[in-house]
Amino acid sequence: MKNTIAPTCLVLIIACLSCCACTQSGTAGLHLNGTWQLVTGMTITGKDTVPYAGDFRMIKIINDTHFAFLRHDKNPPKDSSNHFDAGGGIYTLSGNQYTEHLDYYSDRNWEGKPFTFTVEVRGDTLIQTGIEKVDAAHIDHIIIEKYVMVR
């Protein structure tokens, strides 16, 4: 009986470590932490593709558990149409599936909703593709954004 306890414990320890290694290896290749500046973005609704990012600056800040984004007009008008946009919350990352759980946003229709993206990092470039669907705001489109790491 004593001879089977040690091998059994060893097998259980190896199994536990293997599970942990599998969980971490799925995201080991992706390094999202940092400050990212939006370079290009587009939305696709049906057959309509609308590029954006030319008239404003946007950054996304990601740490181990949270994300935030900040956006403002490049050339702000002198009247009340000056626009600033911000949001943030927690995120999860499983393999290349990045899900933002939007806890704070200037348009409350978006709050409390998860948005899942497929992410890819190439050097200092982050590309995220996903679907934004917010019934209350009449939003249902594919979104593709390309960011570059701010140094």
Tell me the role of every PLM-derived stretch.
Residues 19-86, 99-151:
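Lipid interaction determinants
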Residues 1-31:
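Bacterial Sec-dependent N-terminal signal peptides
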Residues 90-92:
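Beta-propeller blade signature
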